[in-house]
Amino acid sequence: MTQEYDNKRPVLVLQNEALYPQRRSYTSEDEAWKSFLENPLTAATKAMMSINGDEDSAAALGLLYDYYKVPRERRSSAVKPEGEHPEPEHSKRNSIPNVTEQPLISAGENRVQVLKNVPFNIVLPHSNQLGIDKRGHLTAPDTTVTVSIATMPTHSIKTEIQPHGFAVGIPPAVYHSEPTERVVVFDRSLSTDQFSSGTQPPNAQRRTPDSTFSETFKEGVQEVFFPSELSLRMPGMNSEDYVFDNVSGNNFEYTLEASKSLRQKQGDSTMTYLNKGQFYPVTLKEGSSNEGIHHPISKVRSVIMVVFAEDKSREDQLRHWKYWHSRQHTAKQRCIDIADYKESFNTISNIEEIAYNAISFTWDINDEAKVFISVNCLSTDFSSQKGVKGLPLNIQIDTYSYNNRSNKPVHRAYCQIKVFCDKGAERKIRDEERKQSKRKVSDVKVQLLPSHKRTDITVFKPFLDLDTQPVLFIPDVHFTNLQRGSHVLSLPSEELEGEGSVLKRGPFGTEDDFGVPPPAKLTRTEEPKRVLLYVRKESEEVFDALMLKTPSLKGLMEAISDKYDVPHDKIGKIFKKCKKGILVNMDDNIVKHYSNEDTFQLQIEEAGGSYKLTLTEI
């Protein structure tokens, strides 16, 4: 049986070539088929086909030839049932007849009606291997149309369409013993302009089936749809069809869980009180009106930073940050820190300390993100003058979208803070509550927030200016290792496309992370840092200022030798005694980073022709 079907050839195979020339349109079926069947199907032709084992092929061609020899008027009147209303002929051709409809054509029992000028493939039943071999020669082999012209098999015939991911098969109601199946074949290389009602002549409109595609076919492949299943036609979803492809910048909401000032004036920003070095939770979420919708593109990167509230030039801001850093006990002291709480790491990833005053991380807008941050600088730490009002500070959050191909954030918000030391925030709140309770309502000139309405949650205020880029601070002491300076924040979207470990690297990355091209290799000339010490002997009350020419142990020896007439070559050891009583050997690192403008009591001891110096911290 298998050998018998292997010897049979297909009746008609037209390859679906992408460059196949467009055939001219015919106004009638008779003209189309008669132009195709130019030579009559003689008995000799049938005999030759029978000798080659193509009885079915000869029968099929005879069916088609005899069918189109019948006049058009007789065919139209013969296929119309008497009990139905007359309807346009194109609806007859594009629908599968019911079981009760009987064909009245004497030339044969099977009919295959195909849209004119559309390539298609016809193969014999059970010749799956033959169909596979021929599909390998087609230009667009992702769709194969199989039409049975013999007795309808009892199993399901399916046409798999790989690009759409579903199979289109003959409906179960069509499986009956009467082999009267008709299949409508569409060529996807046709555009919707060819099917529009405004550009087609009346005759072409009458023969054209409705299409559920709203856009031009994009692939030159075939698709098969039965009339009852045309509703299954679904265009592929492109990136522009996503519900949430581009992140909207107006739907983000950030909150800080900290105490707010009770003395809020109308129109002013909310003042939040923080304790220096204490961690406070910051919550980030996307407050879209379409709640419950899962956004397919949902990763964003946010940068939390401490910035100055007042408008200052970039040079002034860097000068204030450098002064603050020079007053710290360690060069690694940061302006803002993030806690490694498990609650935080479950909602964020890719945490990077991109600067001393900024931290960036990635989070999913489908979920709520929470981070714990601490601020390590006071408002009064930026000036050497005592008793002056400190500089106001802001916590600012910039959010960048994955699809944002620029350095401009999609959303920016801030809240004004005032940082206290040693639980000063709680004392400030209690002091305001006490003053508010003593003040009479009639004497109040500014509207105060009632104490019973006070909450510990501050909502960040949106900032409309998205063009001004904040200043990132990176101390000069790290230039020798990192070869980078303080510059303006610039986060490219390429950084958002990958996710690494929780702490991707630490505390800094490469120049590419900031969107700044690597600088040319120039010799960096920077002035040596000067160190000033205040020293006095135990018997003295006034301090002497020791200015070290070089911030090193050798520079300290030279300064002491010049000031106290101690021979430089006879100085043996120099010790530093901390306030805790710890005695350590003085070295270059301590002199350079931990001794500037500190006060010491100097003790000089002579033993064995050498001097031992001890600097006791006061």
From Swiss-Prot:
Keyword Oxidoreductase: no
Subunit structure: Binds DNA as homodimer. Homodimer, also forms heterodimers with GRHL2 or GRHL3.
Function of the molecule: Transcription factor involved in epithelial development. Binds directly to the consensus DNA sequence 5'-AACCGGTT-3'. Important regulator of DSG1 in the context of hair anchorage and epidermal differentiation, participates in the maintenance of the skin barrier. There is no genetic interaction with GRHL3, nor functional cooperativity due to diverse target gene selectivity during epithelia development. May play a role in regulating glucose homeostasis and insulin signaling.
Disruption outcome: Mutants are healthy and fertile, but display an initial delay in coat growth, with older mice exhibiting hair loss as a result of poor anchoring or the hair shaft in the follicle. They show reduced numbers of abnormal desmosomes in the interfollicular epidermis. Develop palmoplantar keratoderma. They also exhibit mild chronic skin barrier defects with altered keratinocyte terminal differentiation, increased expression of inflammatory markers and infiltration of the skin by immune cells.
UniProt protein name: Grainyhead-like protein 1 homolog
Subcellular location, record wording: Nucleus
Start and end residues of each stretch annotated as Transcription activation: 1-91
Further comment found in the protein's record: GRHL genes (GRHL1, GRHL2 and GRHL3) show a paradoxical lack of redundancy despite their extensive sequence identity in the DNA-binding and protein dimerization domains and the fact that the core consensus DNA binding sites are identical. They have related but remarkably different functions during embryogenesis because of their differential spatiotemporal expression patterns during development.
InterPro entries tied to this protein: CP2, TF_CP2-like
Pfam families the record matches: CP2, GRHL1_C
GO annotations of cellular component type: nucleoplasm; nucleus
Superkingdom of source: Eukaryota
Any one GO biological process: establishment of skin barrier
Family that this chain belongs to: Belongs to the grh/CP2 family. Grainyhead subfamily.
Transmembrane segments: none
Residue ranges of the region described as Interaction with DNA: 380-389, 427-430
The Grh/CP2 DB domain, residue ranges: 248-474
Molecular function GO terms recorded: chromatin DNA binding; DNA-binding transcription activator activity, RNA polymerase II-specific; DNA-binding transcription factor activity; DNA-binding transcription factor binding; protein homodimerization activity; RNA polymerase II cis-regulatory region sequence-specific DNA binding; sequence-specific DNA binding; transcription cis-regulatory region binding
Major site of localization recorded for this protein: nucleus
PTM characteristics: Methylation at Arg-9 and Lys-116 may be involved in regulating transcriptional activation.
Keywords: Activator, Developmental protein, DNA-binding, Nucleus, Phosphoprotein, Transcription, Transcription regulation
Modified residues (Phosphothreonine): T208
Annotated stretches, region: Disordered: 76-100
Keyword Cell division: no
UniProt gene name: Grhl1
Tissue-by-tissue expression: Isoform 1 is highly expressed in brain, pancreas, tonsil, placenta and kidney. Isoform 2 is highly expressed in brain and liver. Expression in the skin is confined to the suprabasal layers of the epidermis and to the hair follicles.
